[in-house]
C-alpha cells in the first residue's frame, strides 16, 4: 500500500491562529482519502470488499459513488444493491444526482436497486430484487449505516425472534463464498453498537468464516475481562488485514467543541419511596421470567427495568384517591402488550400488527391521559397557593441566577425559601428540575432529550416548562426566549419539518424565536440543528452509541459557523438519579453497563484503526497524541522468503507475526538521510534516490513514508557496499509488487 499509493498520503493539517475554516469556500471535488478507496478497490484489485470506517463529515456516500463510477468505467455490467434505512434514501438520491451527469443518470439507475433494511418486508424486497436482476452481471452490495443492519442480524440470532436481517445476511455471505468476484462495501462511523461480536459478524460477511459463528466461542477466544484479549489481538488483526479503511472525519476545526457535564442528582425521599416500590415489583417479575424460553425472554429484554427507569425520571405525586405514584397504570393490568406500550411511550406510534385488545389499549391510554390531566390540576393548586403567599418559581429562578450564579447544587442545598411548587416538582423529579434550571445559563438554543415521549419523558418536561413560562411555538404568540418545539415520532412529518425550519433560522441564533427543541430517538434520525449551545440528556441508555448520535445532531460540520469562534462550543449535560442512601439506582446501573460496553468495544475499534490499509497514509489527520500505532509486520520477517498467509487459521497461530504479537518489541533506531541505488543485477543499478538508513542493520527506508525498502550489505570489515562516494548500494530489495494504471476518478 505504501509503495503503490503514496500519492494519497495526507499532509499535516495547517492551523492558522484566528483563521475560520468554516468561512473557506470549497469546490465540489473528491478528497485524496476518497479517491484512495477507488484506487485500492478498482476493477483489477485483488481486494473486492471493505469496511469503510469513516467518521462524521467525511463524505462516505460520495466515496462510494466514486467507486461505483470507477467500476462502471471498466465495465457497465453490474448489479448494484444499496441497502439503507428508509429515512436516508432521499440523501442518497441527492448525492447520486450530484456525482452523476444528467445524460448518464437514467441509464445508470437501471442497475441500482435500493432495499430498506428497516422495512418489515426487507427480506422479501431483497430477494425480489435479486430475482429481477441480471444474473450474467457481477453483483455489488453496499450497506450504509451497516452497524444498524448488523445489530438487527445479531438480534435475529440471539433472540430467535424475527429473521428479516439474517435472511439478507446469509444470502450475501453464501454468494461471497461461492463467487469471490462479489463485491461488498460496508459504510459506518460506528462499527458496533452493543457487542464486539457485531464486529465479527461484519467481517464474516466480508471474508466468510474467519471468526466463529458462535458468540460464546468468539468471546472465549478474543475477550479477556473487559477488553480484547492481548494474546489474540495480533491474530484478530491478521484475519482482517486488507478489509478496513479508516478516516476520522472532517477537520475537527469545522466542529464546535464538546464540553461534557455529568450531573448526579439525589432523589427526594418521596421519589425514592415510589422508585423502591417498583424495584420490588421488577425483582418479582425477574424471578418469574428466568425460566421462560429464550424467544420470550428476548421480548422481555426490550422492556427490562422499564418501571425503575421511568421512576428515575419522574414519579407521580399523591393526587387523591387511587391516583398515586405507586398506582401509575401498567399495561399488564389492561391486558395490553408491554412492548407495544413501550413504543408508544417512546414516541413511536407504529404498533405491531399483532397488537390485540384494542378496547383495552384505548382504556389504558385514557387512564394515562387522566393521570396527566390530574397532574396539571395538582400543580395548579400548589401554584395558586404560592401566588397568595407571594412565592413563585420565577422568583426561585431569579435567586438561582443572581445569588447562586447558576450553580444548581449549591442553590438547592442552601436556598431555604423555595416555592412550594418547586419543592413539589423536585419531589417528583430531581432530574427534570436540575435540567430546567441548568438550561437558564444557556446563551443559545437548547436540546432537551429523553428516550420517553409520553408520561415520564417529554410530556412531563413540557408540563414543567409551562410553569417556568415556556409555551409551544407558533409565529404569533409567546414570549421571546421562552418558546419550545417538538421533534419526534408522535409529531407529524409536516410539523417536524416546520419546527426544524424555524428552529434553524438565522434569527434564532440566540434562541430568541425558539429556545428549546424537545427530541427523542424515534423519528429524529438525520436531523441537523444549528447553533445549539446546550444538550440535556435526561436519562442514560444501554449503549453510548445512541447518546453519541444525539450529540452528533447538535454538533455538525460548521453548524456553529454563524457564531464567533470563541463561542463555538456545546455544553452536554447527562443526568443520573441517585438514592439518598447511595444504593445503586437503575440510572447508575445502566450508565455503568454502557461505560463497560464502550470500553470493550473501544478496545476492538482501536485495532481496526491500527490495521486499516490506509493507516500510514492518513495518520496526519487521524492520530493525535500517539493514541495508537499502525500495524506492521516484524521487520526481520520482511527479508525472509515468506511471512505466511495473513489470515489462515493455522498460520496465524504458528506465525504470530505483527506489531501486536506478544513476542514483538518496539525499539527506536537512529537513521541518517543517504543517497542509494537498487542493485538490478548484471552490474546495473536504478537511479539515485534519497532514503533513510539505519547504519547498525543496513536497512534502508522510504524517505516519505518510512517503510523498509531493502538492505545495504557490509563486508567483513564492516564497510558498506557503495557505488561511488556517498552513494550506497541496496543489495537486497524487499519484493513489493507494484501496481500499474491505477484509476481514481
Model-derived features with residue positions:
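The feature captures the C-terminal accessory region of ATP-dependent helicases
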Residues: 626-745
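Conserved SF2 helicase motif VI
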Residues: 543-563
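Helicase motor interdomain insertion/brace
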Residues: 1-508, 512-531, 567-661
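Conserved AAA+/SF3 P-loop NTPase catalytic/coupling segment centered on the Walker-B
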Residues: 196-199, 541-547
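Short conserved active-site loop signatures built around small residues
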Residues: 535
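Short glycine-rich donor-binding/catalytic loop of glycosyltransferases
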Residues: 522, 540, 562
